[in-house]
Structure formats: structure tokens, C-alpha cells
Amino acid sequence: MSLSLLLLLFLSHLILSAWAHGEKHLAPKGQPGPAATGRNPGGAGGSSTSGGTTSSSSSSVSSAPGASPGIRGSGSEQGSFQWSPSGRRTGSLYCRVGIGFHLQIYPDGKVNGSHEANMLSILEIFAVSQGIVGIRGVFSNKFLAMSKKGKLHASAKFTDDCKFRERFQENSYNTYASAIHRSEPAGREWYVALNKRGKAKRGCSPRVKPQHVSTHFLPRFKQLEHPELSFTVTVPEKKKPPSHVKPKVPLSAPRKSPNTVKYRLKFRFG
């Protein structure tokens, strides 16, 4: 009897200890333990710290680039014209009128021509739409524009006055006409032109015609020199068949021609 009682007591003790251990594991994780309660009495400091961390993380996420696609494109980008980097042509526009002038754009808005190419004559032509281009001075960072009175000037912002229609002529020159301004009764287009002294002409002038040399501009763009593409082809040499060497026959001594004897026939009669 004593052994059976001891065994029962031992088994009951094991069952109770196992049940208590299982209750500890099943307890909810959200309840703070005694160690946590002792470190942060009241829970106010922890909540404020967690709230501050959450707000700082949310602010960092919102300020990260690409977090809000709607913000992209606002700010300074809305006030300036963004052109595609592909298809840009950088160089100068040479007008063959007079002694020849390069179209140049000044930072103060002045537009004229210079015989010698300089920093002001470096232009950048970019496409706006099909057949429509814009012209920007690289040094002045201003756009070529034509007012409603036909006067050429430089604009700090890209507007409709800065749009020109580019046409290729048969003599390899280009003409640039305003895309929005033209003579209303006849519908004649207004062209970018320079006079013989290099001054800008008004596009509304009846003398400014696409057939005149004052409206012809030759684009001079710097193209990168590509390395010469070449390759070497090795042509296999045809092996010549070995020439058969004829055996040398020793030259025999020339045969002596035998002495020829002439026989005369003698006919005897009687």
C-alpha cells in the first residue's frame, strides 16, 4: 500500500507541474510581465516613446523619394519646360546672308547674329512635337521666341511664342517659322531672319520670305567622332601544287651523221 500511495502522489505532482507550465505558455503576449511593469510604471513613457517613433518613421517614409508619386512634378519643375534628353542637337545656326552670321541669344533677351562663332551662338534644338522645335541658348539659358508683332527676343520660360516649325530646304538649309504667329488675311508664315548687318528682322515683314537667304540657316552640330570601324580578313593562301622536277637527262654527244655516198647509175647499152 505504501508503494502505491507514493507512486500516486508522484504522478499527481508531475501532472500538476505540467499543467502549470502549460498555463504559462498559453498566457496572452500583450500582457506586460513583472519585469516590464517594474521598468515602466504607468506605461505613459512607453506610449509616448512608441508614438514618437511611429511619427518619425512615418515622416521619414513620406519624405523618401518615390513614396508619394503625386508630389513628383511639383515645385520648380512646374515652372520650367522639361525636354527629353534624347534627340537634342547642340551646335550653331549659320545664316548665309551677307558675310554670314551665327544666330546668338544674349542673357538680357537680345537676339542677333555674329560672324564669328562664340559662346552665345551655341544653341540647343530640341523637339516639342512633330515638326515643331524649340531653340535654347546654352550660355544664356533662354529660349528663342517671336512676339505677336514679329520681333525676335529671348524668353526665360518656354511658352507658345518659343515654338517654331522646322523645314528642310532643297539646298540643305533649314527655315524656322513661328508655330502660332502668321499674317491673318493671307496666312503667310513669319520666319526667323537676319539682315545683312546681322540684326534680327521682324517676321511680319513682307520681305521675309522662305525663298530669301535671310531665312536660311545651316545647322552646324558637333558630332562625336566615332572610331573607324574596320576588320581584318585573313585570306587563306592557296598552296601551289609542287612542281614536278623533270629529271635531268645527260646530254648525249651529237651523233655524227654518216657520210652519204651518192651512187650514179650508169647505163651501158650494147
From Swiss-Prot:
<keyword id="KW-0325">Glycoprotein</keyword>
<feature type="signal peptide">
    <location>
        <begin position="1"/>
        <end position="20"/>
    </location>
</feature>
<feature type="region of interest" description="Disordered">
    <location>
        <begin position="26"/>
        <end position="84"/>
    </location>
</feature>
<feature type="compositionally biased region" description="Polar residues">
    <location>
        <begin position="75"/>
        <end position="84"/>
    </location>
</feature>
<keyword id="KW-0497">Mitogen</keyword>
<dbReference type="GO" id="GO:0051781">
    <property type="term" value="P:positive regulation of cell division"/>
</dbReference>
<comment type="function">
    <text>Plays an important role in the regulation of cell proliferation and cell differentiation. Required for normal regulation of the hair growth cycle. Functions as an inhibitor of hair elongation by promoting progression from anagen, the growth phase of the hair follicle, into catagen the apoptosis-induced regression phase.</text>
</comment>
<keyword id="KW-0964">Secreted</keyword>
<dbReference type="Pfam" id="PF00167">
    <property type="entry name" value="FGF"/>
</dbReference>
<comment type="similarity">
    <text>Belongs to the heparin-binding growth factors family.</text>
</comment>
<dbReference type="InterPro" id="IPR008996">
    <property type="entry name" value="IL1/FGF"/>
</dbReference>
<protein>
    <recommendedName>
        <fullName>Fibroblast growth factor 5</fullName>
    </recommendedName>
</protein>
<dbReference type="GO" id="GO:0008083">
    <property type="term" value="F:growth factor activity"/>
</dbReference>
<feature type="region of interest" description="Disordered">
    <location>
        <begin position="237"/>
        <end position="257"/>
    </location>
</feature>
<feature type="glycosylation site" description="N-linked (GlcNAc...) asparagine">
    <location>
        <position position="112"/>
    </location>
</feature>
<feature type="compositionally biased region" description="Low complexity">
    <location>
        <begin position="50"/>
        <end position="70"/>
    </location>
</feature>
<dbReference type="InterPro" id="IPR002209">
    <property type="entry name" value="Fibroblast_GF_fam"/>
</dbReference>
<dbReference type="GO" id="GO:0005576">
    <property type="term" value="C:extracellular region"/>
</dbReference>
<keyword id="KW-0339">Growth factor</keyword>
<comment type="subunit">
    <text>Interacts with FGFR1 and FGFR2. Affinity between fibroblast growth factors (FGFs) and their receptors is increased by heparan sulfate glycosaminoglycans that function as coreceptors.</text>
</comment>
<keyword id="KW-0732">Signal</keyword>
<feature type="compositionally biased region" description="Gly residues">
    <location>
        <begin position="40"/>
        <end position="49"/>
    </location>
</feature>
